[in-house]
Design a protein with these regions (language model features):
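Bacterial carbohydrate/catabolite-sensing allosteric modules
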Residues: 1-149
Length: 149
């Protein structure tokens, strides 16, 4: 499954970078299909109550983690920091509520249309895998560099 591989690459890259900077990494791996993810998240966070930084594999999972942390009386970014992945926001003109690694949706759309047109015209597909740059989109769930001690 290509999506699983890309998701694993996402996780691996993030963990490798943290470890190269001297940070320890604890991982909660949940198998799909997800069954009661909030309960798994709650159990993990209870077992590791000193966690102060979280990378969620996507923005939806980050929101689930934030809901669990709210149950514990913790708020981001005061008590912990969290970064999602995908660049979720309600509308293009809104700011990000969640700090996230955002994907260039316009470039994704362009590459998708190009591939689709190749398939429709029965051309040999030139694009099978496209790597596009991502960027950090600051939301309200991480501290600014000046706030980090």
């Amino acid at each position: 499954n290509i999506h699983e591989n890309e998701t694993k690459q996402r996780e691996l890259g993030f963990c490798e970078k943290l470890m190269s900077m001297g940070h320890s990494v604890l991982k909660l791996d949940m198998s799909e299909p997800l069954v009661e993810p909030e309960k798994q998240i709650e159990k993990f966070l209870l077992e590791h109550s000193t966690i102060d930084g979280i990378f969620a594999i996507n923005d939806f999972m980050a929101i689930k983690v934030m809901k669990v942390m709210e149950k514990f009386g913790k708020k981001a970014p005061q008590d912990y920091q969290i970064i999602g992945f995908d660049g979720l926001r309600n509308a293009a003109d809104q700011t990000y509520l969640l700090s996230t690694i955002a994907q260039p949706l316009d470039k994704i759309a362009q590459a998708s249309v190009k591939l689709l047109l190749q398939l429709i015209s029965k051309e040999k597909a030139v694009l099978s895998r496209v790597l596009l740059p991502v960027y950090f989109a600051e939301g309200g769930t991480t501290k600014k560099n000046t706030e980090i001690t």
